[in-house]
Amino acid sequence: MVKISMKELLEAGVHFGHQTKRWNPKMKPYIFGARNGIYIVDLQKTVRMFRTACEFVSDVVANGGSVLFVGTKKQAREAVYEEANRAEAYYVHNRWLGGMLTNFQTIKKGIDRLNYLNEIKLNETINLFPKKERLKLEKERVKLDANLGGIRTMTKLPSVIFIIDPKNEAIAVREAKRLNIPTVAVVDTNCDPDDIDYVIPGNDDAIRAIRLLTSRIAEAVVQGKQIAAERRAAEQDKAADDKAQEQAAAEAAKPEPAAPAPAAEAAEEAPAEEGPIIEVIKKSGSEEDGEAAN
């Protein structure tokens, strides 16, 4: 199970919220107090809610689900890119395109185009195009990769979306809610937590805080994949054992081969085979007796 401590949260500055004049009253249950005009997040609740969120993410992935990391603000881009890649998860870290979820079939056409451009660059068939056309295609590829590179292998909608700053990613939150896709988000004191399924109260502006929380969610994804792999291995072993048992049962059900003929029967047949030889001997004996008589 993924763990996080109060000490780690404090050192990363997760407890620092926004200025008291820039807050959302709906975040009041998660606020410990205020200091020097800045709200302080209740880290005890953060630890508890973060653990719940990690368990949820791990369970979803263990059951074959996928996670999409979303963080397009400057402070979050690097952490989202690196941690999502480490967990081999999908990500959007530059710009959220409207309809990325609700109009996925159209987005999928862009993904297919990107994959095609990547392929012709990799196998160098792009060099067969005129220079002007090559430059145009490369420019198109770079633009598509910036927006769709993190989801280029995504063939269907994700099972969960992890978001840094739901206020900044309001479009992504709305699309996920419309499609009933669960959301896990780092929610600061200026955000509305109502549209988030798994709230993680904390600082969504500090780079260290974002890095810490994102890395632990990535660990939950990795853990879920390990559990899924172990389950598949166990199922394969069980299937192999069942097959071996079926084969053993089939062998046991086969009829036994017929027993060899008793020795007595062989003895009864022997005189019949020796008959001609005995007749020859008798005949020879008769001839010898005749000669002796003469």
From Swiss-Prot:
GO cellular component: cytosolic small ribosomal subunit
Bias kind Basic and acidic residues: ranges: 232-245
Gene Ontology MF: a single term: structural constituent of ribosome
Alphabetical GO biological process terms: translation
InterPro entries: Ribosomal_uS2, Ribosomal_uS2_bac/mit/plastid, Ribosomal_uS2_CS, Ribosomal_uS2_flav_dom_sf
Keyword presence, Ribonucleoprotein: yes
Pfam families referenced in this protein's UniProt entry, alphabetically: Ribosomal_S2
This protein's UniProt keywords: Ribonucleoprotein, Ribosomal protein
Cross-referenced SUPFAM superfamilies: Ribosomal protein S2 (SSF52313)
Biased composition (Low complexity): 246-265
Superkingdom in the source lineage: Bacteria
Region (Disordered): 232-294
NCBIfam families: rpsB_bact
UniProt-recorded name of the protein: Small ribosomal subunit protein uS2
Natural source organism: Desulfatibacillum aliphaticivorans
Gene: rpsB
